[in-house]
């Protein structure tokens, strides 16, 4: 028998927000580690390493994240012959997915640094790793902040895909509540509004940071 949608049902949806944010932060942290290595491999002198990074990016950017989630969830179970919980599978899948996109964002930020900065580092007789660490990466980090925050917004919304394997985040909570109340036209607009509340402030932060960095670099914006 269907039940009405009231305060308890709304609170159930709110209780799913922490798991959504935790998954997003975990995937962003894991993706940051992977993405940094990918970005560096994309610019190293070694051609095989550049090919490896390019292949990784092509694989994860060129396939649906849903398929990546399926392969991770069921692949781990088959490979290790164990029952895999949804949480580690989802976290791994989204970390690998995030790494491909963050790697390209950060590679572009590194390559945006003027060549004169590299030449100045070479004049100081710094090795390639030290050039990156002391000269290039600090400047690239500043440039990469707006697109990284923008990707974080997309990542929060993409975590809704985790509902397909039963991970209880905001979308899955909405599905469960719809199954008990039979009121999808009430539940899903509320879920959408909660996603908007989570993502809109980050979008504003990304736009503000982009304007400030463009102003610092002397780039004119056209509206």
Spans of model-derived segments:
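Transmembrane alpha-helices and adjacent helix-loop boundaries
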Residues: 1-223
């Amino acid at each position: 028998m269907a039940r009405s949608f009231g305060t308890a049902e709304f609170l159930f949806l709110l209780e799913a927000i922490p798991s959504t944010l935790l998954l997003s932060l975990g995937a962003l942290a894991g993706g940051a580690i992977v993405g940094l290595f990918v970005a560096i491999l994309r610019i190293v002198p070694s051609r095989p390493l550049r090919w490896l990074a390019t292949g990784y990016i092509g694989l994860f950017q060129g396939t649906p994240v849903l398929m990546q989630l399926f392969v991770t969830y069921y692949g781990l179970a088959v490979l290790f012959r164990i029952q895999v919980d949804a949480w580690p599978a989802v976290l791994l899948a989204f970390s690998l997915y995030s790494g491909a996109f963050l790697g390209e964002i950060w590679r572009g930020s590194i390559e945006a640094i003027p060549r004169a900065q590299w030449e100045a580092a070479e004049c100081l007789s710094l090795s390639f790793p030290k050039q990156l660490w002391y000269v290039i990466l600090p400047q690239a980090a500043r440039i990469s902040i707006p697109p990284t925050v923008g990707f974080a917004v997309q990542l929060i919304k993409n975590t809704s895909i985790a509902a397909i394997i039963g991970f209880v985040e905001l979308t899955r909570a909405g599905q469960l509540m719809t199954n008990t109340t039979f009121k999808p036209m009430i539940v899903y607009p509320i879920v959408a509004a909660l996603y908007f509340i989570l993502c809109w402030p980050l979008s504003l932060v990304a736009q503000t940071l982009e304007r400030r960095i463009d102003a610092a670099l002397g780039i004119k914006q056209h509206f």
